[in-house]
């Protein structure tokens, strides 16, 4: 249950009012309480804060350096806890350049795949859809805007591998630096994994469709492949507009195991 959330934006201007630096912050205080479970050890009360910061600095008119910072619990709760085990880490740090017909992203970023992890409320986003969100990858991405059939669309392609740099660790409660021996899909020597997605809207209806292939790492029995399809539709009912959302995702050899998964 989320208790409090807030978001704010800020910009620093120079050279007669032109803004080169911008920042966006989001703060959420939440409480997760499991009051009954087949496993008594899972009956926990966990209160925590999640703070996200998006920073951008324009090097030129079409070129910028972008960073995403996250402060949140690093460890899963083993007992009741109250604002414990928090750490700060760099989720994204990349250079982007807009060529007009396409944007190129280079560095550490979150490749596009699905949208429910961002759009769905409560546990449907944070606890379910975030299981298949692709985050903290090193590589290159291309985003191509398309205007067609009365709608705005984006075709995205990314090649990547897991981040094993110092940025994979955290400050405060440390999560440790990732290494090849840790295994896990996309944890390879080079960008051998990829995702391809298309998203957009037709009026009040939005959609996203994506495929991914993540190469197995050390100790994994197979490569992971996945497909996602999502739809949204907004209804203007006057003073209280509302939106419906549906997204399904299917994976073969999920997390490099022999198991499939559906969300």
Write out the residue ranges for each language-model feature:
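Outer membrane beta-barrel
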Residues: 45-165
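Membrane-embedded beta-strand positions in outer-membrane beta-barrel channels/transporters
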Residues: 50-52, 91-94, 103, 139-141, ...
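Transmembrane beta-strands of outer-membrane beta-barrel pores
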Residues: 29-37, 69-75, 99-101, 108-112, ...
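Detector for outer-membrane/organellar transmembrane beta-barrel domains
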Residues: 17-20, 152-156, 189-263
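Transmembrane beta-strand segments of Gram-negative outer membrane beta-barrel proteins
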Residues: 15-36
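Cleavable N-terminal export/targeting peptides
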Residues: 1-20, 60, 123, 148-151
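Extracytoplasmic loops and strand-loop junctions of Gram-negative outer membrane beta-barrel proteins
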Residues: 35-38, 122-126, 176-183
């Amino acid at each position: 249950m989320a208790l409090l959330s807030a978001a704010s934006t800020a910009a620093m201007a120079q050279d007669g009012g032109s803004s080169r630096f911008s920042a966006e912050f989001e703060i959420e205080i939440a409480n997760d309480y499991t009051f009954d479970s087949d496993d008594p050890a899972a009956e926990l009360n966990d209160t925590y804060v999640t703070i996200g910061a998006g920073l951008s600095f324009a090097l030129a008119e079409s070129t910028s350096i972008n960073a995403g910072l996250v402060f949140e619990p690093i460890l899963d709760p083993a007992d009741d806890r109250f604002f414990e085990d928090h750490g700060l880490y760099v989720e994204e740090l990349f250079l982007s350049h807009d060529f007009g017909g396409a944007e190129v992203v280079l560095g550490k970023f979150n490749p596009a795949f699905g949208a429910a992890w961002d759009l769905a409320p409560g546990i449907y986003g944070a606890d379910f859809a975030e299981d298949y969100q692709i985050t903290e990858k090193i590589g290159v991405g291309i985003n191509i805007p398309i205007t067609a059939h009365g709608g705005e669309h984006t075709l995205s392609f990314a090649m990547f591998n897991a981040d094993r740099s110092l940025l994979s660790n955290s400050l405060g409660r440390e999560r440790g630096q990732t290494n090849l021996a840790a295994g896990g899909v996309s944890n390879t020597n080079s960008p051998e994994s990829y995702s391809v997605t298309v998203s957009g809207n037709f009026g009040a209806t939005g959609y996203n469709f994506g495929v991914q292939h993540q190469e197995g790492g050390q100790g994994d029995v197979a490569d992971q492949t996945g497909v996602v399809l999502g739809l949204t539709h907004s209804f203007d009912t006057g003073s209280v507009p509302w939106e419906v959302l549906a997204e399904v995702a299917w994976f073969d050899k999920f997390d490099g195991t022999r198991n499939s998964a559906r969300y």
